[in-house]
A protein has these predicted regions:
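Short alpha-helix boundary/capping and kink motifs at helix termini
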Residues: 1-86
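Solvent-exposed functional surfaces
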Residues: 75-272
Length: 272
């Protein structure tokens, strides 16, 4: 290839991507989550030409771009991108050393206020809205930035979520994470907005509740595990969501509650 460095915009088909990946030696460990995320963006038409390049060394070795190439294959759709060839192999050590632009960064560029909080809550609400509360608590799926931005643009009610989250946190502290609160409030508000506001106001304050009130039982349960290790694990997130839904269902029926449990293997409750 010689000493010359070339840069050219090329259309990478799945077949070309496979050939390029054949020159992949000593590249980063593959993140399947990232591959799947990029593939969804390509499939959805969300991928935009932004100047990021697939890079090859002087000897033809792939230095950067394996996740994008794998995503082209997974999406089974072509991608137009910049391809740079002829780089020194040592330059691979400096690649991807900059800070990745987050969804919060993108929202800031759009002029959104409280962009970091909006990004976090919008993602949680999106999962609850599209897949249900159990999936939101599991937090396994990684929506694309395009999916979340589209959801934000189409969901002005997210302003209500932000306001409710701030009000709850100011009274309750860390009883529920902001993301957990947002997804639960959204789910309950779709059933009865006024009831959802009253439920979480009482949960935050704990005022004027009878000993067998489901909200008080839930509050005591959440406060007891507030500082325990493992609170943010997947299983515990699912447990907290399930307990909150159980308390909500009992409270909506006007039924007393003595004990609140969610056992391993138990079906996730449906909010009513």
């Amino acid at each position: 290839m010689g000493e010359k460095i070339t840069a050219k915009v090329e259309t990478i088909t799945p077949e070309i991507a496979k050939t390029m990946l054949g020159e992949n030696v000593n590249n980063r460990r593959i993140s399947r989550d990232n591959v799947n995320l990029f593939a969804r963006e390509i499939r959805n038409g969300e991928w935009r030409f932004n100047g990021e390049a697939i890079k090859f060394g002087k000897d033809g070795r792939l230095l950067d771009g394996q996740h994008r190439l794998l995503a082209v294959i997974a999406a089974d759709k072509p991608l137009t991108t910049l391809v740079i060839r002829g780089l020194e192999d040592e330059t691979q050590q400096t690649m991807d050393s900059g800070k990745t632009r987050t969804l919060g960064d993108v929202l800031t560029l759009r002029g959104e206020k409280k962009s970091t909080q909006l990004a976090s809550l919008a993602r949680a609400v999106y999962l609850a809205d599209q897949l249900g509360m159990e999936a939101a608590a599991q937090n396994d799926l990684k929506p694309t930035r395009g999916e979340i931005i589209s959801f934000i643009d189409q969901t002005p009610q997210l302003a209500d979520v932000l306001a409710a989250s701030r009000a709850f946190r100011s009274q309750s502290g860390d009883m529920l994470t902001s993301s957990m609160f947002a997804s639960l409030w959204w789910t309950f508000a779709h059933i009865d907005t006024d009831a959802a506001n009253r439920f979480f106001t009482s949960l935050a304050s704990g005022a004027n509740l009878q000993a067998d009130d489901p909200i008080l039982i839930l509050r005591n349960t959440l406060m007891a595990q507030l500082h325990k290790a493992g609170r943010s694990t997947r299983d515990n997130r699912v447990r907290i969501a399930a307990l909150t839904i159980k308390a909500w269902n009992k409270w909506r029926k006007g039924k007393p509650l003595r004990q609140l449990k969610f056992s391993a293997g138990e079906s996730f409750p449906t909010p009513r």
